[in-house]
Amino acid sequence: MLLKALCECSGAPGGEKEVRQYIAAELERIGCPYEIDNLGNVIAHHPGKSGKQKVLFAAHMDEPALMICDVTERGFLRFKAVGTRVTPRQLSSRTVRVGENVMGVVGFAPYHMMRITDEQKRRSAENQHIDIAAESKERALERIQIGDYAVVDSPFIEMGENCKGRAMDSRLGCCAVLELLREAPDKAFDVVFTTMYEVGQRGMEVAAYTQQPDLVVSIGAVPATDIPGSLNKEGRVELGQGVCMALTDAGFAYPRNTVEAWSKAAKEAGIKSRVVQYAPDAAQAGYAALCRNGALALSLLIPCRTPAAPAGIMKKSDLNEAVAMLKLIAEKC
């Protein structure tokens, strides 16, 4: 399964090598020409008839991660978060992969053994460590290096019509775009799998500048709010609703006429979709729209429960609707 293989790849910001290699192998298998730029973006060019607009489809490869910054005398690893979406609550007692393939467990001292009384400080990353079962600092440094990345290790599981996996926020988009290239119509368009989304969308900045698209369509995940305790302030997002289109997100307000036009086109084509008022994360389309002379932007999102957490849950039918929407855009532009 394509999504399973992508979720099992490690892809810290700036360390997307595994994801990039897998995507490059898939592009070669389907015969799609591509290049890798100086920042590590994979840029694919689908051949075909030129359309009315130059379209760029975008998905990011990286995921929230950790970086090893110190080793204690007893061999425990100290770390810091890479990106803004890593929380100590997500990491507690999680299995992680450090460096090439060193397994470890995130731990912290039991509360009753801490001198700290403040609850927030107790839960901070400063009081967490990674245990790789090394007996000393010297033994630990034989297996890892300062500066190595670590990512949470969580198995991919099919749960009936749903799937659970790690790094869903990025790998859902990569999967959808690869499926588009597999089944694409006879139209010319470009695709970019970007690096370093989690640390400021650095890969998208370069790709949008060099490709100069008329329309940028990014594809990622949106947190589903169909869970206990969700306030649903921006409207309910549920698994099984199909592909979502954002009017606004944390970084951009999308042209209403563009969103409404594609929402109408989806309805006419029988594609299950809905417009959401607000998405909590800044999508790449909005960022790319500001490069050079600007571009039209559309943010497509697949509902997923806890997409940026170590384990997200999505519905297969939503991914299928997203792929159908990408194909529709490629055909009509």
Predicted regions and their residues:
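N-terminal hydrophobic/helix-forming segments and targeting peptides
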Residues: 1-333
